[in-house]
């Protein structure tokens, strides 16, 4: 183990000098420094980011640098940060370094560990599947279905329901799927992670789930690398055990944001909107590892914050290129009280083809989008001149469009405590059948309000009956 000394500490950036004759650590190697706090020795892990020349390196701290001073000895571990993998990770909660943070027993020193930095699978190892992953959420299954082994992005601004949607997907898919799930909290609220942990514990899903957190209060180094920690755990189940793994990441934007902070601290010249010049490379290195191979699959569902609802911002725009399906959440729909606030016209999926979803599903989805698009075009006329200026056919279309718009909303299991309404899981065949009947005009006489926040069409009729229809 070669050793050096700290020469400079600027927040989470630490410069270490090894001497011009010493063997320098490689980029991404983990370095260890011990600091003395009130007589207790505490270990801090640093990761090598740059070589400065003259035997010095610049590192990023994975933990708080409070208490570090110039002259402290730093040891090179000779390898990258390594985290526990395998069956023993299930039901446990980890930080970026693979340390247990759920209050349970620590992992033994000889436990199997893998480095968090790794090359993406080669071209000939990749596998593409065309099987739809049923979520039980009507708007998703009908208009932008997810693929098993695919990558999904949940896009939305602040407070439009990304985390609630990801929690409902965990509830629906993890319980139905029965396989292994990995949840990675990247730079989000600790409270949400805590709530999710206890909910999963109550439902029993935690026994098949590994959880990794690097939350808002962590240094940028931890927030930038924690996604790789979760991914490393998922990769082991895929490559070694041949499992189909679900990988949830909340939130990919925070990964980019942490990269931006680190980049500025390392002295790199910022690029567009102040982001790091290496934004596309960093995103590519993460996303190319989240993939399905001939051994097993990783289906990833990633929440992606959209700053100021601007989809042209470089962070969400860079993520778009890597996804098979996008679910776009729209603030305008939350203001109308439609939850989940998924924009049916902006959301997309490569699964919407007759070959994958079938002819009937494809035709119903296209017709639903056509009706909603026409309604959108007519809204200006309605706002200025009123409904009376529309033709009879247009009036019928508007009525159906409004019923469809409301019927795309749904009560969630994870929101039961707030809404007082039981959550609903709707099978995909039932979803297609119900929307087909609405398009055919079978429910033109049923009040619009009965379609709001319900599951299958039977719930609509029951609600209409209770309203005196």
Curated annotation (Swiss-Prot):
The keyword Chaperone does not apply. It catalyses: ATP + H2O + 4 H(+)(in) = ADP + phosphate + 5 H(+)(out). Its EC number is 7.1.2.2. Its main location: membrane. Keywords: ATP synthesis, ATP-binding, Cell membrane, CF(1), Hydrogen ion transport, Ion transport, Membrane, Nucleotide-binding, Translocase, Transport. ATP binds at residues 156-163. It is an enzyme of class 7 (translocase). The keyword Translocase applies. It comes from the Bacteria. Belongs to the ATPase alpha/beta chains family. NCBIfam families: atpD. Produces ATP from ADP in the presence of a proton gradient across the membrane. The catalytic sites are hosted primarily by the beta subunits. F-type ATPases have 2 components, CF(1) - the catalytic core - and CF(0) - the membrane proton channel. CF(1) has five subunits: alpha(3), beta(3), gamma(1), delta(1), epsilon(1). CF(0) has three main subunits: a(1), b(2) and c(9-12). The alpha and beta chains form an alternating ring which encloses part of the gamma chain. CF(1) is attached to CF(0) by a central stalk formed by the gamma and epsilon chains, while a peripheral stalk is formed by the delta and b chains. This is ATP synthase subunit beta.
């Amino acid at each position: 183990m070669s050793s050096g000394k700290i020469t400079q500490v600027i927040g989470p950036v630490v410069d270490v000098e090894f001497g011009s004759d010493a063997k320098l650590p490689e980029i991404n190697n983990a370095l260890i420094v011990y600091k003395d706090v009130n007589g207790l020795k505490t270990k801090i892990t640093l990761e090598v980011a740059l070589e400065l020349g003259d035997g010095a390196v610049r590192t990023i701290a994975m933990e708080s640098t409070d208490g570090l001073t110039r002259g402290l000895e730093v040891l090179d571990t000779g390898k990258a940060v390594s985290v526990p993998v395998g069956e023993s990770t299930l039901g446990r909660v980890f930080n970026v370094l693979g340390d247990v943070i759920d209050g349970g027993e620590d992992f033994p020193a000889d436990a199997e560990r893998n480095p968090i930095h790794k090359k993406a699978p080669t071209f000939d190892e990749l596998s593409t599947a065309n099987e739809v992953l049923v979520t039980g959420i009507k708007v998703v299954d009908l208009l932008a279905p997810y693929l098993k082994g695919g990558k999904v992005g949940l896009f939305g601004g602040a407070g439009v329901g990304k985390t609630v949607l990801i929690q409902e997907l965990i509830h629906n898919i993890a319980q139905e799927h029965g396989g292994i799930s990995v949840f990675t909290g990247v730079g989000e609220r600790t409270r949400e992670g805590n709530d999710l942990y206890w909910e999963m514990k109550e439902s029993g899903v935690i026994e098949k789930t590994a959880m990794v957190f690097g939350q808002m209060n962590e240094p940028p180094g931890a927030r930038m690398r924690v996604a790789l920690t979760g991914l490393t755990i998922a990769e082991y189940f895929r490559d070694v055990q041949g499992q189909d793994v679900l990988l949830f990441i909340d939130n990919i934007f925070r990964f980019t944001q942490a990269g931006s902070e680190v980049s500025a601290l390392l002295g790199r010249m910022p690029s567009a909107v102040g982001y790091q010049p290496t934004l596309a490379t960093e995103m590519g290195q993460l996303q190319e590892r989240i993939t399905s191979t001939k051994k097993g699959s990783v289906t990833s569902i990633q929440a992606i914050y959209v700053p100021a609802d601007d989809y042209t911002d470089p962070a969400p725009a860079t993520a778009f290129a890597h996804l098979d399906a996008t679910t776009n959440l729209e603030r305008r729909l939350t203001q109308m009280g439609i939850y989940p606030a998924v924009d049916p016209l902006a959301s997309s999926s490569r699964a919407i083809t007759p070959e994958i979803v079938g002819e009937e599903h494809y035709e119903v989805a296209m017709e639903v989008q056509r009706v909603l698009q026409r309604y959108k075009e007519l809204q200006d006329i309605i706002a200025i001149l009123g409904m009376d200026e529309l033709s009879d056919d247009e009036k019928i279309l508007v009525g159906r469009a409004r019923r469809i718009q409301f019927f795309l909303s749904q009560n969630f299991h994870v929101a039961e405590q707030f809404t007082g309404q039981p959550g609903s899981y709707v099978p995909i065949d039932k979803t297609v059948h119900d929307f087909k009947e609405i398009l055919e005009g079978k429910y033109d006489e049923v009040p619009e309000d009965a379609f709001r926040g319900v599951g299958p069409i039977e719930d609509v009729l029951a609600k209409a009956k209770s309203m005196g229809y």
